[in-house]
Structure formats: structure tokens, C-alpha cells
Amino acid sequence: MKLSCLLLTLAIIVVLTIVHAPNVEAKALADPESDAVGFADAVGEADPNAIIGLVSKGTCVLVKTVCKKVLKQG
């Protein structure tokens, strides 16, 4: 029972990490009347500390809830 709770917790952490991952936006910058030579620029704005804080807060709440339920059953 404890192993399944641990696996569930890890699965939820992975899902939260994927869902709240920062989006990267790629833009192609070129003049409409340009020659065959083009210019492309990829811009990404991400704050890794914000993701870590969000995931860690959610993980703490989840682990507390799971531990309380496991302790009540055991």
C-alpha cells in the first residue's frame, strides 16, 4: 500500500512538472520583400525558480495529505 502511494505521488509530480513547464515561443523575423537569405530568432522566457517553487509547494501539500491517509489506515 505504501509503495503504491509513493508511485502515485511521483506520477503526480511528473504530471505537474510537465503541465506547468514554461512555453517557448519561436518567431521568424524577416522582411516580406527579402532575398533568399532569411533571419530567424527563437525567444524563450522561463523562470526555473518559479517552476521549482510551484512544484515543491504542490508536492508538500500532496505528501502531507497522502501521509495523513496512510497513517489513518495503518
Curated annotation (Swiss-Prot):
Residues 1-26 form the signal peptide. It comes from the Eukaryota. Residues 27-50 form a propeptide. InterPro entries: Pilosulin (IPR049518). Expressed by the venom gland. GO terms for cellular component: extracellular region. It is found in: Secreted. One of its GO terms (biological process) is defense response to bacterium. The modification Glutamine amide is found at Q73. Pfam families: Pilosulin (PF17499). Keywords: Amidation, Antibiotic, Antimicrobial, Secreted, Signal. Shows moderate activity against E.coli and S.aureus (MIC<25 uM), slight activity against B.subtilis (MIC<50 uM), and no activity against L.garvieae, P.aeruginosa, C.albicans, and S.cerevisiae. Has no hemolytic nor cytolytic activity. Causes an IgE-independent histamine release. Belongs to the formicidae venom precursor-01 superfamily. Ant pilosulin family. This is M-myrmeciitoxin-Mb1a. It comes from Myrmecia banksi.
